[in-house]
Amino acid sequence: GLFVFGSNDYYGPKPKNPFSYLFKDGGRRKLGPELDWKGLHKSLTGIGWLDLNHSREVIKINDTIIEARGTDDAHLNLDNYSEVAGLPDKKAHLAIGVTHAPYLRILEAMSRDNLDLIFAGHTHGGQVRLPWIGESRALTTNCDLPTWRARGLTREPNQPWLHVSAGMGTSPFARIRVASPPEVSLLTLEAGF
C-alpha cells in the first residue's frame, strides 16, 4: 500500500460551526489535539506500506512498472511539491500521484508532470450533497476543488484522471452525511485507459 498524511492524521477533531465549511477560511485552521502520527507512520511502514509524503517510489508488479509520488497535507500547507516534481520515469507504465487534500495547486503541478492518475480524499465526498442539483452537487469540498469533483473518478480535458474517495468518516461534532454515503474505493486499472 501507499500512504500520505492528512490533517486528521496529525490533529484530532475540534468543535466548530459546521456552516463555516461553506466559506473560505483564509488558511486559518482550528486544530484539535495533536495525534500520534509518528506511531501511525511506524505502524504503516512496519507492515510494508510506502510513505509517499514528499517521496517518489518505483514499484514493479509482475511486468508492470508504476511510479508513485505524493505530498504531505496541502490543507495544513505542509505540501512541497518541488521535492517530488519532474516527469515520470520513462520506463513507468503508469504514473500516479497521491495527496490527501486535492488543492488545485497540487493537481496542476501533477498534471504538468504528466501523471496519469491522482488519488485524493479530504472532501468526504462533500459530506452533504444536494441530490436534485445536477448529478448530486456537493455543498463544499473544504478546499479549492470544484464541488462537482468532490467524489469519484473525474477528468478535465488534457488532465490526469482524479479519484477522490468520499471516505468513511465524519466529524464527531457533525455526524451527518446527506446523499454522500461512506465509501471505500476499489479501482481496477486496465491497459490503455
Protein language model annotation of sequence segments:
Residues G1-I59:
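Core catalytic region of metal-dependent phosphoesterases/phosphodiesterases
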Residues G1-S7, L52-H54, I96-H100, L117-G125, ...:
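Active-site neighborhood of phospho(di)ester-bond hydrolases with catalytic His/Asp-centered motifs
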Residues S7-Y11, E57-I59, D73-L76, A101-L104, ...:
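Solvent-exposed loop/turn segments at secondary-structure junctions
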Residues D25-P33, R69, F173-L186:
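Short, electropositive alpha-helical surface patch
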Residues W49-L50, R56-A68, K90-L94, R155-L162, ...:
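Beta-strand-turn-beta hairpins that frame and shape the catalytic cleft
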Residues N53, L78-V84, L139-W148:
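N-terminal post-signal-peptidase region of extra-cytosolic proteins
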Residues A74-D89, G97-I118:
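Active-site-proximal loop/helix segments of hydrolase catalytic cores
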Residues P102-S185, F193:
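Conserved beta-sheet core of the metallophosphoesterase superfamily
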